[in-house]
């Protein structure tokens, strides 16, 4: 009889932990909005109320500002990774995968300004660098797999290096955090990411792939508009 009781306790603890994580992510989303408006150095109760937060709530769910920032960046990665978890891309055309990811990025990150991330990188550089490395590793692997899939499907050029293209993409993506290249008031993460995807596809596709990309991009644009 001990094992069922232990199982129930373990299950309850697991559900409680997941609930707490979801709550922290919800708060992190609101914190990003707060930081974009008021910065990270001063948490004013009146300003917090405007984004649906309170000082008491923050103290209950976060140990300090580092914990807040770490959760904000973790949630950003989680939202990105969920796209690949929600879609089963097995058997899909490589170009369609790129377009689906671009559309989902646009839907989920349409209002995410690089200005917040730039602020976080300046105040907590070590936390930010850890985030950047984890995000880069994830995107690199997905990009590399896609390029190799597209080559096998006859959509991408056979003489491209999947590793080199993936690394170049990561380098350009990380330029998002350089305000001299992308002024944060003029660009969102989604806009920059999708433009980079567009440039990559145009550079690595062969004639058949370019024709397919043009056709499918128009289709996805119509579906997304609806």
What label would you give each PLM region?
Residues 1-16, 149, 186-226:
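C-terminal peripheral helix-coil segments that are non-catalytic and often amphipathic
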Residues 23, 65, 72, 76-80, ...:
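Hydrophobic/aromatic residues within well-ordered alpha-helical segments
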Residues 99, 144-148, 162-170, 190, ...:
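Short, well-structured alpha-helical segments
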Residues 1-38, 45-46:
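Basic, helix-initiating cap at the start of DNA-binding domains
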Residues 87, 116-120, 176, 180-183:
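Secondary-structure edge/capping motif, primarily at the C-terminal ends of alpha-helices
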Residues 26, 30, 34-67, 71:
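Helix-turn-helix
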Residues 71, 82-115, 166-169:
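Hydrophobic alpha-helical connector segments
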Residues 110-144, 151-160, 164:
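Short secondary-structure transition hinges
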